[in-house]
């Protein structure tokens, strides 16, 4: 829920979330973008919230950029080129850019999602359990991508459970605990 709240997908009951001294609580993703904050969100549910499972890589690339077009027609060529570049640079194993992403392994699905989101050059990258269920090689690829973003000055909000990973990747760690008092 923390990631969704920061991304503007859920409303906070109280408090403030400041990004560059601007309170973003209660703002929709569109309003946050209008404030000049470019962000990307890697949700925990990769195929439910992040990508459209029945679509191929090219069409999933378009989800982030189709509104930027100047025409009512969609030019798929840049999205296809991006998909091919991501396959090459992230070593995504897929039969092709039109293969539904639901047919890819979990690690490859995560590479598609993270690659698309990083390509938009966000100032803020929000990730929820980005390596959950992935093999060790895919996990290290994801860690490397996140570290590259951090080196570029991107603010990375990393939600995770593995303390060793958190200590290695994070500059600051916040421990959150949901506590409800027992009923009498």
Region annotations inferred by a language model:
Residues 128, 135:
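ABC-family nucleotide-binding domains
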Residues 160-161:
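H-loop/switch region of ABC-family ATPase nucleotide-binding domains
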Residues 119-123, 129:
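A short, proline-enriched helix->beta-strand linker immediately N-terminal to the Walker B motif
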Residues 15-24, 33-37:
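Conserved ABC transporter NBD signature motif
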Residues 179-184:
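Conserved small/polar residues in nucleotide/adenosyl-binding loops
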Residues 172:
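Short, glycine/charged-rich "phosphate-handling" switch motifs in NTP-dependent
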